[in-house]
């Protein structure tokens, strides 16, 4: 097996590009319980336990020329924002309390043995929570 000698730790830090960073941040805080680590209208870093979980970036911000096309209506076609949850039952209660749109679930995925809930996230993205 080929292994890169310079790679010590790899942590995903997905960036979601949205029109309204502040509204998307509020959704992730309200529904997933994440914490604002930056705040602002152009960029947000959302954390859990001090670790970055997801980044939000505004379409029109200039410093990243390869974010995509804001005029393309597809949001994450083929890409899902997937989060592991320690307390899946608590998450489902919270989803109900926040009136989050549930697309599917809760269901048991026979391949992973995990329960899943697929919900509508900000600006049309699909967010999946999975847990025991």
Descriptions of predicted regions:
Residues 2-12, 34-82, 92-120, 131-132:
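Vicinal oxygen chelate
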Residues 17, 81-84:
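Active-site-adjacent beta-strand anchor residues
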Residues 24-29, 95, 124:
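Conserved active-site tyrosine of GNAT-family acetyltransferases
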Residues 23, 87-92:
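Short, conserved charged micro-motifs
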Residues 122-128:
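Short, contiguous alpha-helical
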Residues 15-21, 111-112:
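Conserved beta-strand-loop-alpha-helix junction that forms the acyl-donor binding cleft
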């Amino acid at each position: 097996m080929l292994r890169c000698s310079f790679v010590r730790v790899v942590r995903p830090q997905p960036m979601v590009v949205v029109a309204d960073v502040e509204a998307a941040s509020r959704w992730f805080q309200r529904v997933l319980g994440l914490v604002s680590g930056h705040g602002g209208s152009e960029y947000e870093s959302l954390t859990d336990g001090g670790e970055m979980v997801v980044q939000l970036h505004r379409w029109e911000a200039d410093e990243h020329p390869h974010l995509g096309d804001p005029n393309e209506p597809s949001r994450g076609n083929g890409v899902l924002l997937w989060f592991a949850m320690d307390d899946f039952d608590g998450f489902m209660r919270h989803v109900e309390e926040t009136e989050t749109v549930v697309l599917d679930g809760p269901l048991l995925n026979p391949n992973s043995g995990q329960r899943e809930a697929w919900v509508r996230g900000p600006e049309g993205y699909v967010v999946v929570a999975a847990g025991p």
